[in-house]
Structure formats: C-alpha cells, structure tokens
C-alpha cells in the first residue's frame, strides 16, 4: 500500500525531514503543499546545485535568475526582460491547451516584472514526422495553441526553431520564450513586504483545471498519462490581455509592493515565493478566493493551476484604488490575506486555521537538494566512433542536396510561422525565416535581435561540447543580423536526473553552457529546467535550448542572409574540416546518428564574431549567414533562395566532395561583399588573423558548385526553393488528421 507521502510524490527521507522541521506530522493539506512545492518542477532539487556555475552578472544585468524573468539594460533608460519556460508534459497529452497555456504563463512572467511583452519565440521538438499520424497531431495542436494564444494577445511570434528526432516520439518539447520592454524605473519584483499590507487576488476564478500539474511535469510519461488530462490547464487569452493591461496600469500607480503570477503549483507557489523574497510571512483565507466550481476543498484551491491569475501585494489603504482599475478592465479583484511579521504561511478556511508552514520551507530555497552520482552512458564511446571512409560518397551530390533541403530539420518552417502573427505592433524589422528576428525599439535608433538555438543531436553525442555550440550558434545568428549578443535565457530539457547517465548529461551541459557564456560575455539571466522528459521506451536527447538577445545600436545597420545583387563576391570565413559526426547529412542520407561532433575553438569563435559584426556595422557586408545544419551547400542554397538569385561557387580542396559540401565545421560564416569593398574586407580579416577564402559570385538563377574544377552541384534556384518551401507542408498534408 502506498504511503500518503508517496502518493504526493515525496520520498521517505523527505517526509521525515518535514516531520522534523514542523515538530509534528503534516496534515493532509500541508502534505499536499509540500508534494507540489518539492516536486522537481517547482523545487529544482536535482538541478539547483549546478546553477552556481552559470555566469549571471555583468555591467548590463539589472536582474539575474531568481525572479519572474531576467532583465538586461539596452541603454536610453530602457531594458529587456526575457525568459524561456517549458510546457512539455501538458503538450504531450493535450497539445493545443498545453502549448497555449505555456505561452500564457511566460507572458505573465514578463509583465509581472512591469515589462510590456513585445515578442514571443518558441523551440519545439517532435518525433520523426514522416508517416506518423500521432506526431502530426501533436505538431498541429502545438502550433495552433501557440498561434491561438499569441495572436489573440497581440504579441508577435517572431522566431523559433523546430526539430524532429525519434527520441521525442512520445515526449515532445514545447519551450516558449517571451521578451518584454521596460523602463529602468518601472521594474517590479515578486516580493511580499510591509507587515499589514494586503494580499490581493486578481483575474480569473479558480477551478480544478491544472491540479497536480507541477507533479505531473515531474514524472515520466507513461500510457496512463493520458488519464491525467485534468492536470492540463485551460487558457483564455482574452482574459489574459485584460489582465496584462490592468496589471501594467496598476504598477504605474505606486500602490503595488509586489506582484507574482499564479503559475506552477498555483496559489501556494505564489504565496511562499513572495513571502520568502520579502523575508516574512503571510496569512490567506481560501474562502475568499473566487471559484468557478462548487465543493472545492482548501488543497484544491491552493494548488489549482487555473490560468490568468495574479497575486498582488498592495500597500495598505490603497486596496480600493486597485479595485477600481481592475474593475475598469472588466476583471475581479479581492483581498484574500495580509503580510505578517513571522515566517509562516498560514492558511485559513474562514476562522479556522487549516495549515501553517514556514514559508521558506516550501520555497525552492528550502527544498532538499540532491547531487546524484553521474557517469557517461555505457555506449557513448561506441557512439562517438565513426570511420568516415566507411561512409559511401553519393554519386549524385545535386540529388543529395535536394534531399537535405527536403529534410524536416532543414526545410522551411513557413508552414508553421505563417500561422503566427509576426507583424502585429509593426515593430518587426526582420521576420521569421532568417538567422534571427529583429525588432525596432520605438523612440530610439536601437533594435534587438532574438533567436533560440540547440542542436540536440550534438548534445546527445557530446553534451558539454554540444551545449557550447548551442551558445555560439545563437550568438552567430545574432551577429549575422547585425546585433551584439548581450544575454541568454536557457531552457534545459533532459531525462531523469536520478540515473547516472541522465544527471551526467545535465551536468555536462551546464558546464558547457557556462564556459561558452563566460567566453562570449553573455550572462545567463533567467531560465528553466525540465527533467523526466522520457517515456517507458527511453529518454529524449539532451536539449539545452539557448534563447539569446542581441543589441543593435543602429537599426539601419541590420543584415540578412539573402544574397542581394549579381556580381557580389561570396566569401567564407572559417575553415571546413572533415567533420560530419552528428551531422544532418549523416543522419538524413546515411541513417546514422553517431561520431565525434565538430570541434569548437571558443577563442577563434569570439574573434570571428567580433570581426563579422564590425564589418556589418561598417556597411561592408551585403549578406551574412552562419553555416550550421547541412553545411556549406545548404547554407549557400538558403542564401540564394532567400535572395531569389543564383550563385557560382568554386572550392579547391583535398577533402572528399561530400564532406566539403555537407561538413558542419564550426565557426564559419558565409558573407557577400560588393566588389569595391572586397580588398578592404580581406585586409581586415588578414589583420585579425581570421581564416577566409573567396568562394565565388552571386549570379544568374542557378546554384552551381565546383570542387577542384568539377561541377558537383547544378540546380535551378526556383526548383530548390520549391523543394525547400514545400517539404514540410507536403509531409503534413500526406496524412490528413481527422
């Protein structure tokens, strides 16, 4: 028979610790509160000990990890708030609502800081798409959910990434990122301080949806998980839009001491987090909490994850001022408690105390911490072995390029992003489909560049080096758009931390991210960890997603990947080596997921990025694109397709033809230069000791690639574009979903 504490997800030692701390056994309500608050999703009990490795401060960081979102200065008294969070398990069970409420939750985190949300991004992972109706159902539902919520909120979804791999077959990943704009003096935090100040509840009424959501997100997905649809929240974007406007207006009045959204674990989480930050306590009465269902008991009220709700700490005597503004926006507000001078979270049901717990003991800072044993997977050494000579070289490399452009991981994601409103508010300068999205900051000359990145196949084969590559690839995308990378938010998605292999993958990824962020001067200002992304058949590939923001001082100096004019000179920065381990070429063409991933030289990477950005800002670059999945051939094709113009490329090398075309060697940029600027650019690259070579010319309507004088690729740009743009839509339409 299962013990009561096991039923709420606690271990025997954890329960014993609770009894010792309280000096008594917890009652049913208290036990349930510990169950959700000490779940992995809320407590970070297996990951928190690794956070110390992250660089989290810097001259531009105004708020690092620990609040609802991180904030970084962009000058002119303005700042950017940003955060990424996962909603993986809910999206696996109920893809539309799972994705929609993931978007809603991250938006609330941003406006809880006092920032107006200005952009959304996402990073998605699914199983192999071809011939799998279940994967198509999940993809359709997730995309519709993201679009349905973001579009209704009037916040543009400007970028993201989508990858397909069989490791995500039963456990898709849905990571949502939100970015907000805020003035320095408007920053607010989730702190409950000032004894006697009122605790006010604002927004939607509380129901039973989402009960146990935090615990559900902290468990392995099984066949029985379908029965837990009640743990998936239901969102209302129109309610959230009203809530956003009401909260931003309230924050301008000076009446709000602290503000916190009701997200994972609902009311109990918001109460204990704000009380702990304020180093005090709190009393609340569950009978005063608005409900939309009858018969709800205190524990249901406390842990419900109903959406579109906020907790406000209001200066005593100004409650009516709050009520009037909330009412103006068609919402409901009510006083449910007050700040106290002890350290307790005291829960009343009318006059009766039904729970009394030290607030800090519920908070993640008071939860147990674990540092499990770790070891690399037993088959890792074998996985990393790859004899390139055993890989047959395709006879028709044009056909190989066409196949790669049709791969769902490389093909255009237009089928997805055309469902998103990416132009609402008319600040989007560079739209989805380029290396990074770019938004103007109205009233200034500035802009920001935004991207999300992670090659999870690299992280599967080498989590530390793969995580470094995630950081620098994000930075490359920012730089290619004309921005200087300034900060990241990380979404760390892994399997179980309770296996040596799972924790080793997580630990290695954190160390890799930390090293790269330190070298690239991009502090980690916020983030999220999602463990137990696995099914009974196995774990997902390690997926540490990097969301990055870059600053563009002069919005007129942005850059895109598109080839611009016939006669422009194509220049490759960096060196191509025999590195196809973990590549899209090896996986898509040869069906192998193995090998040593490409080597990364962080020092060279930093020098390269600095020089590329300087060249773009100096108006010496026509187009810029980083080379990643698919290598040189795919990169040139993408630039040609984007510009609607062809290219002639010539390479002299001792490498095999397929390796020249499809190697994914790191620290490479493809740029086009006007002929009159070529000498200047080459001299600057030479002075900076940047390896580079002139590859060819932008010309005509064909892509022609020669290696050692032999034409190995000759394709019509129009035909390549048709393949690239149509591949994903063709796959989605090949098996209609009822």
Swiss-Prot record:
Catalytic reactions on record: N(2)-formyl-N(1)-(5-phospho-beta-D-ribosyl)glycinamide + L-glutamine + ATP + H2O = 2-formamido-N(1)-(5-O-phospho-beta-D-ribosyl)acetamidine + L-glutamate + ADP + phosphate + H(+)
Annotated GO MF terms: ATP binding; magnesium ion binding; phosphoribosylformylglycinamidine synthase activity
SUPFAM superfamilies for the chain: PurM C-terminal domain-like, PurM N-terminal domain-like
Chain sites annotated for binding Mg(2+) 1: 85, 528
Single GO biological process annotation from the record: 'de novo' IMP biosynthetic process
Active site: 41, 87 (proton acceptor)
Localization per record: Cytoplasm
Gene Ontology CC: cytoplasm
Positions of Mg(2+) 2 binding: 109, 261
Binding site for ATP: 44, 83, 490, 527
Pathway per the UniProt entry: Purine metabolism; IMP biosynthesis via de novo pathway; 5-amino-1-(5-phospho-D-ribosyl)imidazole from N(2)-formyl-N(1)-(5-phospho-D-ribosyl)glycinamide: step 1/2
Keywords: ATP-binding, Cytoplasm, Ligase, Magnesium, Metal-binding, Nucleotide-binding, Purine biosynthesis
Primary localization: cytoplasm
InterPro entries for the chain: PRibForGlyAmidine_synth_PurL, PurL_linker, PurM-like_C_dom, PurM-like_C_sf, PurM-like_N, PurM-like_N_sf
Family: Belongs to the FGAMS family.
Described function: Part of the phosphoribosylformylglycinamidine synthase complex involved in the purines biosynthetic pathway. Catalyzes the ATP-dependent conversion of formylglycinamide ribonucleotide (FGAR) and glutamine to yield formylglycinamidine ribonucleotide (FGAM) and glutamate. The FGAM synthase complex is composed of three subunits. PurQ produces an ammonia molecule by converting glutamine to glutamate. PurL transfers the ammonia molecule to FGAR to form FGAM in an ATP-dependent manner.
Complex and partners: Monomer. Part of the FGAM synthase complex composed of 1 PurL, 1 PurQ and 2 PurS subunits.
Protein name: Phosphoribosylformylglycinamidine synthase subunit PurL
């Amino acid at each position: 028979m299962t013990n009561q504490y096991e039923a709420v997800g606690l271990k025997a030692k954890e329960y014993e610790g609770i009894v010792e701390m309280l000096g008594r056994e917890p009652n049913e309500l208290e036990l349930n509160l510990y169950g959700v608050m000490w779940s992995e999703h809320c407590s970070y009990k297996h990951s928190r000990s690794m956070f110390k490795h992250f660089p989290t401060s810097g001259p531009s960081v105004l708020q690092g990890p620990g609040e609802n979102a991180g904030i970084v200065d962009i000058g002119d008294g303005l700042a950017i708030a940003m955060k990424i969070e996962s909603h993986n398990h809910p999206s696996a069970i109920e893809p539309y609502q799972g994705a929609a409420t993931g978007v809603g939750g991250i938006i609330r985190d941003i406006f809880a800081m006092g920032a107006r949300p200005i952009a959304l991004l996402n990073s998605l992972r699914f199983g192999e798409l071809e011939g799998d109706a279940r994967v198509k159902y999940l993809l359709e539902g997730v995309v519709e959910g993201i679009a349905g919520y973001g579009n209704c909120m009037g916040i543009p979804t400007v970028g993201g990434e989508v990858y397909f791999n069989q490791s995500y077959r039963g456990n898709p990943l849905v990571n949502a990122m939100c970015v907000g704009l805020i003035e320095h003096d408007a920053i607010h935090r989730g702190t409950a301080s000032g004894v006697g100040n009122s605790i006010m509840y604002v927004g939607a009424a509380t129901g039973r949806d989402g009960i146990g959501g935090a615990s559900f997100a902290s468990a392995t997905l099984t066949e029985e998980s379908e029965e837990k649809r009640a743990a998936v929240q239901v969102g209302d974007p129109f309610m959230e839009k009203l809530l956003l406007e009401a909260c931003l207006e309230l924050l301008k009045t000076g009446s709000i001491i602290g503000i916190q959204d009701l997200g994972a674990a609902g009311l109990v989480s918001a109460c204990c987090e704000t009380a702990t930050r304020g180093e005090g306590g709190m009393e609340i009465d569950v009978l005063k909490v608005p409900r939309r269902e009858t018969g709800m008991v205190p524990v249901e009220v406390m842990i419900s994850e109903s959406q579109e709700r906020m907790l406000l700490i209001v200066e005593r005597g100004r409650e009516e001022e709050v009520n009037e503004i909330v009412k103006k926006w068609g919402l409901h507000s009510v006083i449910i408690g007050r700040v106290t001078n002890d350290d307790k979270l005291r829960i009343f049901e009318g006059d009766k105390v039904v729970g009394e717990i030290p607030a800090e003991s519920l908070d993640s800072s008071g939860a147990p911490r674990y540092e499990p044993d770790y070891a690399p997977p037993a088959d890792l050494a074998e996985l990393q072995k790859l004899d390139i000579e055993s890989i047959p070289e395709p006879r028709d490399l044009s056909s190989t390029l066409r196949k790669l452009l049709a791969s769902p991981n490389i093909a255009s994601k237009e089928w997805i992003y055309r469902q998103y409103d990416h132009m609402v508010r008319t600040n989007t300068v560079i739209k989805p489909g380029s290396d990074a999205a770019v938004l103007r900051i109205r009233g200034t000359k500035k802009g920001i560049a935004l991207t999300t990145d992670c090659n999870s196949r690299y992280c599967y084969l080498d989590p530390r080096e793969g995580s470094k590559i995630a950081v620098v690839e994000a930075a490359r995308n920012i730089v290619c758009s004309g921005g200087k990378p300034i900060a990241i938010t990380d979404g760390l998605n892994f399997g179980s931390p309770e296996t040596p292999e799972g924790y080793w993958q997580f630990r290695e990824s954190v160390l890799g991210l930390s090293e790269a962020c330190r070298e690239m001067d991009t502090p980690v200002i916020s983030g999220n960890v999602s463990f137990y992304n696995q099914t009974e058949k196995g774990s997902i590939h390690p997926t540490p997603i990097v969301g990055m923001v870059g600053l563009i001082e002069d919005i007129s100096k942005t850059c895109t990947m598109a080839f611009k004019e016939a006669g422009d000179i194509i220049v490759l920065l960096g060196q191509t080596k025999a590195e196809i381990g973990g590549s899209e070429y090896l996986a898509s063409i040869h069906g192998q997921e193995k090998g040593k991933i490409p080597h990364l030289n962080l020092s060279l990477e930093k020098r390269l990025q600095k020089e590329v950005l300087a060249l773009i800002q100096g108006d010496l670059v026509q187009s810029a694109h980083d080379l990643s999945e698919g290598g040189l051939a795919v990169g040139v094709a993408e630039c040609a397709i984007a510009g609607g113009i062809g290219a002639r490329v010539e390479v002299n090398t001792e490498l095999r033809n397929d390796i020249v075309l499809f190697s994914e060697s790191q620290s490479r940029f493809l740029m086009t230069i006007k002929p009159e600027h070529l000498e200047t650019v080459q001299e600057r690259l030479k002075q900076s000791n940047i390896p580079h070579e002139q590859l060819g010319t932008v010309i005509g309507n064909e892509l022609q690639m020669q290696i050692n004088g032999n034409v190995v690729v000759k394709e019509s740009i129009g035909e390549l574009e048709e393949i690239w743009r149509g591949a994903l839509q063709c796959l989605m339409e090949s098996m209609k979903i009822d």
